[in-house]
Curated annotation (Swiss-Prot):
<dbReference type="InterPro" id="IPR050075">
    <property type="entry name" value="LeuD"/>
</dbReference>
<dbReference type="GO" id="GO:0003861">
    <property type="term" value="F:3-isopropylmalate dehydratase activity"/>
</dbReference>
<dbReference type="InterPro" id="IPR004431">
    <property type="entry name" value="3-IsopropMal_deHydase_ssu"/>
</dbReference>
<dbReference type="InterPro" id="IPR033940">
    <property type="entry name" value="IPMI_Swivel"/>
</dbReference>
<protein>
    <recommendedName>
        <fullName>3-isopropylmalate dehydratase small subunit</fullName>
        <ecNumber>4.2.1.33</ecNumber>
    </recommendedName>
</protein>
<dbReference type="Pfam" id="PF00694">
    <property type="entry name" value="Aconitase_C"/>
</dbReference>
<comment type="function">
    <text>Catalyzes the isomerization between 2-isopropylmalate and 3-isopropylmalate, via the formation of 2-isopropylmaleate.</text>
</comment>
<keyword id="KW-0100">Branched-chain amino acid biosynthesis</keyword>
<dbReference type="GO" id="GO:0009316">
    <property type="term" value="C:3-isopropylmalate dehydratase complex"/>
</dbReference>
<dbReference type="InterPro" id="IPR015928">
    <property type="entry name" value="Aconitase/3IPM_dehydase_swvl"/>
</dbReference>
<keyword id="KW-0028">Amino-acid biosynthesis</keyword>
<keyword id="KW-0432">Leucine biosynthesis</keyword>
<keyword id="KW-0456">Lyase</keyword>
<comment type="similarity">
    <text>Belongs to the LeuD family. LeuD type 1 subfamily.</text>
</comment>
<dbReference type="GO" id="GO:0009098">
    <property type="term" value="P:L-leucine biosynthetic process"/>
</dbReference>
<comment type="subunit">
    <text>Heterodimer of LeuC and LeuD.</text>
</comment>
<comment type="pathway">
    <text>Amino-acid biosynthesis; L-leucine biosynthesis; L-leucine from 3-methyl-2-oxobutanoate: step 2/4.</text>
</comment>
Length: 201
């Protein structure tokens, strides 16, 4: 998993509340069990005018040329609600997004994102609105997300602080998923195993 320390990137917005996981990655695309290849189906029902995905919707932000290559997504309250599909952060990451900034997130999506290297940043509604306004006002506007200092820097230079559980921050800073986190304690695990009776191993 790619570590997340500081990232500066082009920002794109979807100015909607309650964006659920079925909109993020519709159910008909969930048959794969590997993490790659989901980006093309991200927000399928909004990005395309046809079921086959051959006709991009020119009105949808992710299809607009000014947002091509965006790596930071701005959204509104309760992002990632709905069913607990881990494919949702897989699709967002595979598309090239590194961070989602919104006033609030669904709990399960929030945890799944951290476990897959996607940083969910919760700011106030007013702060998210300011970021959206600045991004809308200037093509190519970039936002910086600094996990080392837990700050977001807007295109105009305004700074907003955010909080993240230290355990989640540690995993993201070091690029550790659940397996990687366990392996980082391999020496302690081995030491413990030598201290217990054989029949208990």
């Amino acid at each position: 998993m790619q570590p997340f320390t500081t990232h500066t990137g082009l920002a794109v917005m979807i100015d909607s509340t309650n964006i659920d996981t079925d909109q993020i990655i519709p159910k008909q695309f969930l048959s794969k069990v590997t993490r790659d290849g989901f980006g093309v189906h991200l927000f399928h029902d909004w990005r395309y005018l046809d079921d086959a995905g051959d006709q991009p919707n020119p009105e949808f932000s992710l299809n607009q040329s000014r947002y091509k290559g965006a790596s930071i997504l701005l959204a509104q309250e309760n992002f990632g609600c709905g069913s607990s599909r881990e494919h949702a952060p897989w699709a967002l990451v595979d598309f090239g997004l590194r961070a989602i900034i919104a006033p609030s997130f669904a709990d399960i999506f929030y945890g799944n994102s951290i476990n897959n290297g996607l940083l969910p940043v919760a700011l106030t509604h007013a702060q998210v609105r300011q970021l959206m306004d600045e991004v809308a006002a200037e093509a190519g506007a970039q936002i910086t997300v600094d996990l080392t200092s837990c700050k977001v820097i807007s295109p105009s230079g305004a700074e907003f602080s955010f909080t993240l559980a230290e355990s989640a921050r540690h995993k993201l800073l070091n690029g550790l998923d659940a397996i990687g986190l366990t392996l980082s304690h391999a020496a302690q695990i081995s030491q413990y195993e030598t201290q217990i009776q054989g029949w208990r191993r």
